[in-house]
Curated annotation (Swiss-Prot):
Homotrimer. Interacts with host receptor CXCAR. Interacts (via N-terminal tail region) with pentons. Belongs to the adenoviridae fiber family. GO terms for biological process: adhesion receptor-mediated virion attachment to host cell; cell adhesion; symbiont entry into host cell. All late proteins expressed from the major late promoter are produced by alternative splicing and alternative polyadenylation of the same gene giving rise to non-overlapping ORFs. A leader sequence is present in the N-terminus of all these mRNAs and is recognized by the viral shutoff protein to provide expression although conventional translation via ribosome scanning from the cap has been shut off in the host cell. InterPro entries: Adeno_fibre (IPR000931), Adeno_fibre_knob (IPR000978), Adenobir_fibre_prot_rpt/shaft (IPR000939), Adenovirus_pIV-like_att (IPR008982), Attachment_protein_shaft_sf (IPR009013). Pfam families: Adeno_knob, Adeno_shaft. This is Fiber protein 2. It is found in: Virion; Host nucleus. GO terms for cellular component: host cell nucleus; viral capsid. Induction: Expressed in the late phase of the viral replicative cycle. The tail region anchors the fiber to penton base capsomers, whereas the shaft, built from several repeated motifs, allows the knob to protrude from the virion.
Length: 387
């Protein structure tokens, strides 16, 4: 067998025939992977690497090191840098110092909130109640009515007629006869007064009264040639007008006739139904109270039946018919002013004057026979008047 003749310029390093392949695409044999390798410069096999891998001055592979990273004995290590608050360095561990309302929860930095602050949809917000709104990304007062803002943006109270703001006080702006010091009052002159019920009232003297329409008229006590005529108030009624044990269970007739400083009284009562038709008690009393002007107050007698005899008008301001408060002191449990004893049957009657703390009153008392209808005989009494 004839040996193949080897050319004198044969190169045993791959690629073998460089002269026939002047453009060498890759210097590694086809059975070697090109991963991690490259031809740089052409015809030279070299490693392919990127940062942080590099070579040193001795053409040895090494790493690029940043700040706080060192290579000691072939090992990489990190050096925790010097920190400033709120960062901390403890045992080569970097941390974050927090104080309320900032905290760390579930490895996350959180913000602790309390009402009215809240966190909604990962956003810090504020809850507003009545009187507050959020306008133009700011919390604002929501005024209404007389409240408003002045030129400096301060909340103020708008005052209209009759009121004004003086310094830090809201005061009444009044004119006479009104007066406002600690409270609103009314200056009164002669002829006017304020009643216990807080009403402005005209003070009436002798000979004057109010009619049913509230107008001032001459009273029923008329002076004729220097002699005072007799006047009468009574409770005459064809229908039941008195409620003792139940509604309208009796008919009460009371007649007061004035003559000078005295009043002659006549009274009779008749039970019409219920317990008054068959008495269980051995006594019965009826109290008629009046205010300081002689007006009948709420009691057993229907006030609509208490009228002047002469005009048939409802009696009002009958001060001239009231028991004298000096002769008959108020709320005294003294002996009754009059007493009448009937012999057949034996019925006792008495009347007590001004058994009341204020104003005037008549308290009529009768004895009764249990088991029988209550209908005592007519009684007569006399007393001295207030005027």
């Amino acid at each position: 067998m004839k040996r193949t003749r080897i050319e004198d310029d044969f190169n045993p390093v791959y690629p073998y025939d460089t002269s026939s392949t002047p453009s060498i695409p890759y210097v590694a044999p086809p059975f070697v992977s090109s991963d991690g390798l490259q031809e740089n410069p052409p015809g030279v096999l070299a490693l392919k690497y990127t940062d942080p891998i590099t070579t040193n001055a001795k053409h040895e592979l090494t790493l690029k090191l940043g700040s706080n990273i060192t290579l000691q004995n072939g090992l990489l290590s990190a050096t925790v840098p010097t920190v400033s608050p709120p960062l901390t360095n403890s045992n080569n561990s970097l941390g974050l110092a927090t104080s309320a309302p900032i905290a760390v929860s579930a490895n996350s930095l959180t913000l602790a909130t309390a009402a009215p602050l809240t966190v909604s949809n990962n956003q810090l917000s504020i809850n507003t109640g009545r009187g507050l709104v959020i306008t133009n990304n700011a919390v604002a007062v929501n005024p209404t009515g007389a409240l408003g803002f002045n030129n400096t943006g301060a909340l103020q109270l708008n005052a209209a007629g009759g009121m004004r703001v003086d310094g830090a006080n809201l005061i009444l702006h009044v004119a006479y006869p009104f007066e406002a010091i600690n409270q609103l009052t009314l200056r009164l002159e002669n002829g006017l007064e304020v009643t216990n019920g807080g009403k402005l009232n005209v003070k009436l003297g002798s000979g004057l009264q109010f009619d049913n329409n509230g107008r001032i008229t001459i009273s029923n006590r008329i002076q004729t040639r220097g002699v005072t005529s007799l006047t009468t108030i009574w409770s005459i009624s064809p229908t039941p007008n008195c409620s003792i044990y139940e509604t309208q269970d009796a008919n009460l007739f009371l007649c007061l006739t004035k003559n000078g400083a005295h009043v002659l009284g006549t009274i009779t009562i008749k039970g019409l139904k219920g317990a008054l038709r068959e008495m269980n008690d051995n006594a019965l009393s009826v109290k008629l109270p009046f205010d300081n002007q002689g007006n009948l107050l709420n009691c057993a007698l229907e006030s609509s039946t208490w009228r002047y005899q002469e005009t048939n008008a409802v009696a009002s301001n009958a001060l001239t018919f009231m028991p004298n408060s000096t002769v008959y002191p108020r709320n005294k449990t003294a002996d009754p002013g009059n007493m009448l004893i009937q012999i057949s049957p034996n019925i006792t009657f008495s009347v007590v004057y001004n058994e009341i703390n204020s104003g005037y009153a008549f308290t009529f008392k009768w004895s009764a026979e249990p088991g029988k209808p209550f209908h005592p005989p007519t009684a007569v009494f006399c007393y001295i008047t207030e005027q």
